Amino acid sequence: MAKLSLRNVQKTYAGGTQVVHGIDMEIADGEFIVIVGPSGCGKSTLLRMVAGLETITGGEIHIGDKVVNDLEPAARDIAMVFQNYALYPHMSVYDNMAYGLKIRGMSKGEIEQRVKHAAGILELASLLDRKPRALSGGQRQRVAMGRAIVREPSVFLFDEPLSNLDAKLRVQMRLELKDLHRRLKTTSLYVTHDQVEAMTLADRMMVLNGGRVEQIGTPLEVYARPASTFVAGFIGSPPMNLVPVARNGSGQGVAQMRVQPKDGQAAATLGHLPMGLHLPEQALMGLRPEHIEPCAVHEAIAELDVRVVEALGADSFAYGSLGGQPIVVRLDSQTQVRAGDKLPITASAEHLHFFDVQSGKRIEAQA
């Protein structure tokens, strides 16, 4: 195991197109880091640079105390698990897992010990004689992981390893990956576009957008205090509501703002905001659907014009608008709302977020 350091890491292709912009991160020995972002944000490129499959055009990558920029992949003491299993179809599970060790000239006894140990961890012991065609998708992915585990690397690299699995298998494999890391405690770098994988697997996560770091933090930190409107809209399902607001004065310790109207709608005033804060003159106000609560009319910060209600069993989502701006609210199964209703809503101070209108960066409301 080893720590991993990314220091001002950059990637620019011929022609001047820069796809990774000066990324810095210190990853502790044994830490599980998830790089998450939309397609094309540079996350797989960054992972491939760590692996040695892409050249680095700026900065340094350290594995342990060694700068690995110019080292071949085989010399970096890493093991990589890809989205495609890349198993040899003519080889058994045992031989697929053992092949890399044979190439390295390891003794037969050591190979057998490592393969059987990994097979035990991954519940593959009864499948070692089977060919890949006789395995399910989840079993094939476990073989691919086993092939990485037997190398006993300093760092595991995962490039969207669950993307080819169906929804049920992805849930199962997420749990198995979490348990696997708990037991092995190997430094891991995991790439995904799936925020659920990021939230459930990561010790810390890096949110990438356009090759730049938007935020690094624990899943709870990123969820509770998004650093930008991009993070607020990317992490969370449904994403955070973002509403343009303008200051409307304050008095007696209670702030007021109005929603900037859309499509000729009348402005909606947000009254009784539960805080006496110096708020910006204009901002984007963020509020997660699960942090908006129905309430009595006299306690409401606003009334939502309900347009559509989706009932999902344990809870439901009410889609509506304030001043023409779209808002979604998560409701429990006991709250009965129908399309066309006006729903009085409120929210507590700690769940209100404000972002700069121009930059999208988080701003703190000052007491």
Curated annotation (Swiss-Prot):
SMART domains: AAA (SM00382). Its main location: membrane. One of its GO terms (cellular component) is ATP-binding cassette (ABC) transporter complex, substrate-binding subunit-containing. SUPFAM superfamilies: MOP-like, P-loop containing nucleoside triphosphate hydrolases. Residues 4-235 form the ABC transporter domain. It is found in: Cell inner membrane. It is an enzyme of class 7 (translocase). It is a peripheral membrane protein. ATP binds at residues 37-44. Keywords: ATP-binding, Cell inner membrane, Cell membrane, Membrane, Nucleotide-binding, Sugar transport, Translocase, Transport. It catalyses: sn-glycerol 3-phosphate(out) + ATP + H2O = sn-glycerol 3-phosphate(in) + ADP + phosphate + H(+). GO terms for biological process: carbohydrate transport; glycerophosphodiester transmembrane transport. Its EC number is 7.6.2.10. GO terms for molecular function: ABC-type glycerol-3-phosphate transporter activity; ATP binding; ATP hydrolysis activity. The complex is composed of two ATP-binding proteins (UgpC), two transmembrane proteins (UgpA and UgpE) and a solute-binding protein (UgpB). Belongs to the ABC transporter superfamily. sn-glycerol-3-phosphate importer (TC 3.A.1.1.3) family. Part of the ABC transporter complex UgpBAEC involved in sn-glycerol-3-phosphate (G3P) import. Responsible for energy coupling to the transport system. This is sn-glycerol-3-phosphate import ATP-binding protein UgpC.
